[in-house]
Amino acid sequence: MKEATNYDLLDGGRKLPLVEDFYTIQGEGFHTGKPAYFIRLGGCDVGCRWCDAKYTWNPKLYPPTDISEVVRRATSCQAQAIVITGGEPLLYPLGPLTSALKGHGLKIFLETSGSHPFSGYFDWVCLSPKRQQPPLPEAFWRAHELKVIVEREADLQWAERNAEQVGRECKLFLQPEWSVSEEICLLYTSDAADDM
């Protein structure tokens, strides 16, 4: 999980450990249902046990890919928005990639735990904070969307504490951890009924 990549091979962000890139429809959060081109990078030092992309954790499994190739593929489809995700994409210098994509007039979205310093240019930041490696303060003021994964009741309080730190315009989402989603939804529904 906590594998480091060889930063010398990344050429200052002109190469990145690309897991996959593809055109799709967004399935979570504020932009659900909108088309986007996803760029998924390898490497994650957060290691959520319920992660649906554990295959991305070890960046050494993904040879550094020249960003010009990624930009070429992203601009060859109809996408107007690019989602950079992982793993944890902020492990890498994203300035060269985001600058190249912005040069084509594309909107750049970032999905991050916020636990590393920001690099790059983003039109939308989806912050998904994790208890085991909390976000840096700058992540809260950069966030346009806060998405907290809820696995148990205590996560609702964690979500509230994080929501208090983001800006007033930030969109707030609770995302049930899928293996316990029915239990979480029943818990939330029961609590809401008690408040009426």
Segments predicted by a language model, with ranges:
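Hydrophobic pocket-lining residues within nucleotide cofactor-binding pockets
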Residues: C44, P89, V150, A192-A193
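A generic structural micro-feature
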Residues: H31-G33, F140
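Single conserved hydrophobic/aromatic residue that forms the stacking wall/gate
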Residues: Y188-M196
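Conserved Radical SAM active-site core
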Residues: G12, L16-E20, P35-A36, G42, ...
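Conserved glycine-rich "GG(E/T)P / GGGxP" loop and the immediately following alpha-helix
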Residues: Q80-I108, T112-Q165, C170-E183
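Polytopic alpha-helical membrane-helix bundles and their juxtamembrane interface segments
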Residues: T5-D8
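Basic, often amphipathic N-terminal segments
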Residues: K2, I25, V46-R49
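A short beta-strand-turn-helix
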Residues: G27-G29
